[in-house]
């Protein structure tokens, strides 16, 4: 099969259908010219799937078959170091492919639920998608979520069953699942092996035949939408665009709709999958544009770019790409306070490439200036931290994540006006701003609707986990003869941190899950405070539902015991609720003792024992005084290790 594929690539190259092109900035005649591809000859499509169903492998085979990369290359569209290390797709990537007289613009998307915003943003560019399902795993939770994302946008969906050459592949079962869940007939499903290349040519043919051409007008003045962007240290913000009308080339003058700024275009091109300069990017095509945008706020996702000579009043801006609301929040601080400014710049630039992140300034007595950052999940948070380290060489502290809560303030004008700026409902993200319980009618916590696909025999185990997480059971439906789809309504606080890890452990990795926001629910919130020798250390305070307080208290106290060095006096660590001094969990770190028997050289005769007891008595009284007035030495590393995720 590999020899046949290589032979086909060689023949296509001979016929001039496909070729790898390189450009020279100094010679315009050597730039790639895509003007031959009218909108009717363009197909913009994406690949969506659950994690580990073969998206990146299929993308590699498509790149090979279209001559964009040499055979044998792997993870060509996973360009970030964190993607290659973890084996997951984090950022959607594009590639322009030539195939039998057509220009196919491929958008590869992530599969993890934490990066659903990337999928949603990519679908704004696509006219069709490949819905990839592994034959040995079947339809999973994220498969269903991705289908409905595309269905709601009225995008053509092509079902593709991958990994058909594996011993555990069950093609008939997967076809039944696709029929029952999405009403796909078996004739619509393509059967492939992305790893070996089996039947991948049929995927390209199906894209040409089934995906509609983009709606575009080449004759109209230039108008395009930014669907992604990133910051280059030398060229500024580089915008990935889909051109809806007209064309753009080097030297053109363009304007942005929201910022109302004018720019001179210095470079245009396409991704193949690396950046390749072109003579122009025309209506219907997907490419990139460089125009000396020097601040990260100028290349926001969803921005409309148009020809500078076109009156702004006559330009129709594109519908805003809806952002996905953050689900978890965590403090982010530089390890060294002197690095604050450089880290601030790195955070701003990375947020340009990841607009789903929300940033607000924060400060800590122990850690200095920093930010409270909102993420779409814990994996999203970990990847953000890894990218700061790998791409910007930044050393950061990411604190324990939490979720947003709300408080309904009592209907009392004095309370609302004096303490809460007249608001009836306040957001709670920071423990230091936790409202007085006497001011609050009720607390609210965010809820999510969780969709899980589990083997039949593990339903009881999974239901037990969800009940333990304060959940409400929903519908149960059959996927096939061996698997069930279970719906539960759970508090986001239970899901956001370690629910998936616990689910995988209980089901030996056979379960998958996806979740979506499902309103708010009344709860009893508490502020967990840490007292060290009776003094509150605000950096360790946390807000959480009362049902989770005892377990979290034990964890924090144990961490602190490991991190705080022994002192000359006894140190008592207590975890309490609010201003109460009653401990949920308590540990005592015993003091260091001075061995007076060594000083007295073991000579206890002639009153030696009395002298020893006298010394020990003096030591005890001295330590009592130190405990009352002394400051406990808590090293900065203790804050880092206790607060970090």
From Swiss-Prot:
Task: Provide the residue positions that the database annotates as binding GTP.
Answer: 49-56, 108-112, 162-165
GO CC list: mitochondrial inner membrane; mitochondrial matrix; mitochondrion
- GO function terms (MF aspect): GTP binding; GTPase activity; mitochondrial ribosome binding
| Top EC class of this enzyme | hydrolase
Known function: Promotes mitochondrial protein synthesis. May act as a fidelity factor of the translation reaction, by catalyzing a one-codon backward translocation of tRNAs on improperly translocated ribosomes. Binds to mitochondrial ribosomes in a GTP-dependent manner.
The family line of this record is:
Belongs to the TRAFAC class translation factor GTPase superfamily. Classic translation factor GTPase family. LepA subfamily.
Annotated protein name in UniProt: Translation factor GUF1 homolog, mitochondrial
């Amino acid at each position: 099969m590999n020899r046949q594929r290589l032979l086909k690539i060689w023949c296509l190259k001979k016929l001039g259908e496909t070729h790898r092109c390189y450009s020279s900035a100094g010679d315009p005649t050597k730039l790639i010219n895509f003007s031959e591809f009218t909108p009717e000859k363009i197909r913009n499509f994406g690949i969506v799937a659950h994690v580990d169903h073969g998206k990146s492998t299929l993308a590699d085979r498509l790149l090979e078959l279209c001559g964009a990369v040499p055979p044998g290359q792997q993870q060509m569209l996973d360009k970030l170091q964190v993607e290659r290390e973890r084996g997951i797709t984090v950022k959607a990537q594009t590639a322009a492919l030539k195939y039998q007289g057509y220009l196919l613009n491929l958008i590869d998307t992530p599969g993890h639920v934490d990066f659903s915003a990337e999928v949603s943003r990519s679908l704004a560019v696509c006219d069709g998608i490949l819905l990839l399902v592994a034959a040995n795993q079947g339809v999973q939770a994220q498969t269903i979520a991705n289908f409905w994302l595309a269905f709601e946008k009225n995008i053509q969906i092509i079902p593709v069953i991958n990994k058909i050459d594996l011993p555990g592949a069950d093609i008939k079962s997967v076809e039944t699942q696709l029929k029952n869940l999405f009403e796909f007939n078996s004739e619509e499903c393509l059967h492939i092996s992305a790893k070996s290349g089996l039947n991948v040519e049929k995927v390209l043919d199906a894209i040409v035949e089934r995906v509609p051409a983009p709606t575009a007008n080449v004759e109209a003045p230039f108008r395009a939408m930014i669907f992604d962007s990133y910051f280059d240290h030398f060229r500024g913000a580089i915008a990935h665009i889909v051109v809806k009308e007209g064309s753009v080339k080097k030297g053109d003058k363009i304007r942005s709709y929201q910022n109302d700024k004018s720019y001179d275009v210095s470079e245009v091109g396409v991704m193949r999958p690396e950046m390749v300069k072109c003579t122009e990017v025309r209506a219907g095509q997907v490419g990139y544009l460089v125009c000396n945008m020097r601040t990260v706020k100028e290349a926001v996702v969803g921005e409309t770019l148009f020809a500078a000579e076109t009156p702004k009043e006559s330009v129709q801006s594109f519908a805003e790409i809806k952002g996905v609301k953050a689900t978890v929040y965590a403090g982010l601080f530089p390890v060294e306070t002197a690095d604050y400014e450089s880290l601030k710049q790195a955070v701003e630039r990375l947020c340009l490439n990841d607009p789903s992140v929300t940033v607000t300034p924060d400060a800590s007595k122990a850690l200095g200036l920093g930010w409270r950052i909102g993420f779409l999940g814990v994996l999203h948070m970990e990847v953000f931290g890894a990218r700061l380290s790998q791409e910007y060489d930044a050393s950061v502290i990411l604190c324990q994540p939490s979720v947003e809560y709300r408080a309904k303030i009592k209907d009392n004008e004095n309370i609302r006006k004096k303490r809460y700026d007249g608001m009836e409902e306040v957001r709670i993200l920071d423990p230091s701003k936790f409202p007085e319980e006497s001011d609050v009618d009720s607390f609210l916590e965010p809820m999510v609707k969780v969709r899980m696909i589990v083997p039949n025999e593990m339903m009881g185990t999974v239901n037990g986990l969800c009940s333990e997480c304060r959940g409400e059971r929903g519908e149960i439906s059959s996927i096939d003869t061996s698997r069930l789809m279970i719906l539960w309504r759970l508090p986001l606080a239970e899901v956001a941190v370690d629910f998936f890890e616990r689910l995988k452990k209980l089901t030996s990795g056979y379960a998958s899950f996806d979740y979506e926001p499902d309103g708010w629910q009344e709860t009893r919130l508490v502020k967990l405070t840490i007292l060290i020798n009776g003094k509150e250390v605000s950096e360790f305070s946390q807000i959480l539902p009362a049902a989770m307080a005892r377990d979290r208290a034990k964890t924090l106290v144990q961490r602190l015991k490991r991190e705080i060095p022994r002192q000359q006096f006894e140190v008592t660590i207590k975890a309490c609720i609010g201003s109460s001094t009653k401990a949920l969990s308590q540990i005592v770190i015993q003091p260091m003792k001075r061995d007076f028997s060594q000083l007295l050289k073991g000579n206890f005769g002639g009153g030696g024992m009395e002298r020893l007891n006298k010394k020990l008595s003096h030591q005890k009284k001295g330590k009592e005084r130190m405990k009352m007035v002394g400051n406990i030495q808590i090293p900065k590393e203790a804050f880092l290790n206790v607060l970090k995720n």
